Amino acid sequence: MGMKFFNPVTPSSRGTILISKIGLSKDKPEKSLVFGKKSSGGRNNHGRITTRHRGGGHKKKYRVIDFKRNRSDQGIVEKIEYDPNRSGFLALISYKEDDTKSYILAPQGMKPGDVVTAGDDADILPGNCLLLKHIPVGSFVHNVELKPGNGAAIARAAGCYAQIVGRDGQYVLLRLRSGQIRLILSSCKATIGVVSNLDHKNRKLGKAGRSRWLGIRPAVRGVAMNPVDHPHGGGEGKTSGGRHPVTPWGVATKGKKTRKKNKSSDKYIKKLKG
């Protein structure tokens, strides 16, 4: 797709860099694969804020995505679409055998007319889904399952991938984008390629309003709050907070390790991040 750079003809367009939508379908989403979605606004079932800085935003419809890829017959890519619920793009797949359709995450380079399939005899081509034991070492994959049959859980965001770096008995060694090397059962599925929209990380929204359209609310600095609201709050005049950076709940931030000790999945991690 590429980037879209704006000339500074208005204050809000100065420095704005967005994702170009050239090549994406302008049609409405497939009606049979769409249903309504109510925004939680960052609240849980008690109505309490559990995730700050969320709320508002444009109304969205949820697209049902096939993360399990259980069909072994060939499908043809009808079009590549924008999805407001995630950073990567979607591919609408049409199966001629029974005239059904499904959405999958579009890998980088996929275009209308491409053929995709899943199964042990699938070719090593972007968009094809295979068991990890059938994918060569060194391949880039996305949509990786953590447990066989549960559906994709790893490497689903724009530009994400994992690399197969080795095998260890019934496990495959997978290097994630964070640098972590993890053991995954070789009977788990993965899709070949890198998730589309690689430039998502380079976009600059340019104005507060565009964040609000996306459902992102303002983030207030702790030093600008009152003492009752944040450990960095209060003080006469402008202050630096007076202590090492912490969250509103007093937990150290900026470098503090957040992973729990003795986590049950530790035995599957060969190397930590970095």
Swiss-Prot record:
Region (Disordered): 35-55, 224-274
PROSITE patterns: RIBOSOMAL_L2
Keywords of this entry: Ribonucleoprotein, Ribosomal protein, RNA-binding, rRNA-binding
An example Gene Ontology CC term for this record: large ribosomal subunit
Biased composition (Basic and acidic residues): 263-274
Pfam families assigned to the protein according to its UniProt record, in alphabetical order: Ribosomal_L2, Ribosomal_L2_C
Biased composition (Basic residues): 45-55
GO molecular function annotations of the record: rRNA binding; structural constituent of ribosome; transferase activity
TM helices/strands, residue ranges: none
GO process terms (BP): cytoplasmic translation
Purpose: One of the primary rRNA binding proteins. Required for association of the 30S and 50S subunits to form the 70S ribosome, for tRNA binding and peptide bond formation. It has been suggested to have peptidyltransferase activity; this is somewhat controversial. Makes several contacts with the 16S rRNA in the 70S ribosome.
HAMAP family named in the record: Ribosomal_uL2_B
Family, similarity comment: Belongs to the universal ribosomal protein uL2 family.
Quaternary structure note: Part of the 50S ribosomal subunit. Forms a bridge to the 30S subunit in the 70S ribosome.
Protein name: Large ribosomal subunit protein uL2
